[in-house]
């Protein structure tokens, strides 16, 4: 499955960055004015920031918020759900020759400058994009492909109160 997904992503011109060397490469892309897309629903381990996700504290990567703040980059939270063929541009096509249709749904656009002077901008931004992701999933739960343990790491009791 991983090889198939990698091949599909690379065939559209995307450069994939491995988790182990991501920070240096992501920093280079951002510093050069590039754009970065990330899967925001991954468990970040015990060092992540814990924010509510479907009512439970979830360890979430800080890098999205940190890089947005450092490079003054917008965070665009979006989903690409499949839509019925009759709603796509090929509405008059027959089922045999229709392409698969998708919609692009922008759920939130987060401006990091809005968080200047806040006591915990990383936590607040992380919570906001996680809430936006949750709304996208709730609209199309049948299309969400969950193959990992999102709540694998749980916070110590002091973090539980912060995430609730």
Predicted segments with their positions:
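Membrane-interfacial amphipathic helices and adjacent loop/beta segments
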Residues: 1-20
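Non-catalytic C-terminal accessory region of glycerolipid acyltransferases
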Residues: 20-164
């Amino acid at each position: 499955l991983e090889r198939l997904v990698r091949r599909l992503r690379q065939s559209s011109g995307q450069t994939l960055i491995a988790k182990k060397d991501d920070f240096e490469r992501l920093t280079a892309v951002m510093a050069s004015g590039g754009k970065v897309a990330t899967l925001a629903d991954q468990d970040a381990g015990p060092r992540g920031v814990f924010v509510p996700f479907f009512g439970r504290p979830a360890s979430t990567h800080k890098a999205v918020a940190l890089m947005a703040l450092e490079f003054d980059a917008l965070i665009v939270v979006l989903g690409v759900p499949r839509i019925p063929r009759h709603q796509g541009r090929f509405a008059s096509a027959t089922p045999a020759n229709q392409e698969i249709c998708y919609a692009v749904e922008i759920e939130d656009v987060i401006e990091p400058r809005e968080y200047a002077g806040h006591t915990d901008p990383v936590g607040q931004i992380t919570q906001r994009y996680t809430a936006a992701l949750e709304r996208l999933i709730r609209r199309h739960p049948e299309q969400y492909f969950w193959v990992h343990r999102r709540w694998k790491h749980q916070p110590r009791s002091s973090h539980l109160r912060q995430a609730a």
